[in-house]
């Protein structure tokens, strides 16, 4: 579920975008490695590095959700909003864990 409030990652948005652009470069490099018939282990090493970098971005966004979105919902005193944000958090963590 999404809403129109400021996202929890707003303070680090530019840093996250920069990191995602670096990851994009890594993925393009992996594509070139395949095109150039590079050694399997070298390709897998780069895939692992890109995946780890992407997981770190995801964790930072998840942290922002907890420290801003969930915190604000709880602090508001609105039990329904707090329950909704908590449910969203649980679903996000479940999806994130499945990625691994």
For the regions a language model picked out, list residue spans one by one.
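Solvent-exposed interaction patches of small proteins and small membrane subunits
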Residues: 1-100
């Amino acid at each position: 579920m999404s809403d129109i409030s400021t996202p929890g990652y707003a303070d680090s948005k530019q840093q996250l975008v920069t990191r995602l652009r670096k990851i994009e470069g890594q993925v393009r490099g992996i594509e070139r490695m395949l095109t150039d018939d590079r050694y399997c282990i070298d390709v897998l090493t780069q895939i692992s590095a890109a995946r780890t970098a992407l997981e770190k971005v995801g964790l930072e966004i998840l942290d922002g959700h907890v420290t801003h979105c969930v915190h604000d919902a709880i602090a508001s005193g609105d039990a329904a909003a707090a329950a909704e944000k908590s449910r969203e958090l649980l679903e996000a963590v479940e999806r994130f864990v499945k990625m691994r």
